[in-house]
Amino acid sequence: MSIPVLIFGLLVSSLLAALPLIELFKHKLIPYIKDDFAIASLTINAEWNGFEWMIGFFLAVVSVYSFAMFQKQQLSKGIFTLLISFAIVIPSYMMMVVPKIEAYSQRPAIEFYQSLSGKDVYVESLGHKSYAQYFYSNSEPKTHPSYYDINWLLTGSIDKPAYFVVKVNHLNRYTKNHLTLIEQRGGFALLVRYPVND
């Protein structure tokens, strides 16, 4: 039982320690990445403090200590130490690291949605599934019966501006459809289609 616990603890702690170091080494990683969205997402500068990797290091130390306790047949002490460490590590990681990862993965899209908050416009995501537009855009209630039809928003006779958040790896597909690029930030772009007055 003690060796699998040690291996698992060291594996998890290595991952937890390595992830915060992305900001330091992203310029070396980018040449090996083939996905345009991932590359563009890494252009975001998340504000790392520099000590987040210590959470993983702490878990590694605790894993080795617990392994030593298991080897000495002090199972309850080893298990208690592991449980307490996870009670510290998980909330610490959630508070200090996860928000910074969110900066790369979805913050630009959420900021786009928030910038449209309260405006009388249509807001949708294109090329990816998301419910963020419903939570963050707070747009005015829709009255047109076709507002839920993405094809109508893209090509139909819309009655107000339609804004779309698209991942950059799908950008070329949609800028051909009478959509205008407003801004690109990280791995996302904000597009708009204005109503045509007949």
Predicted segments with their positions:
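Membrane-embedded architecture of ER/inner-membrane glycosylation machinery
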Residues: 1-198
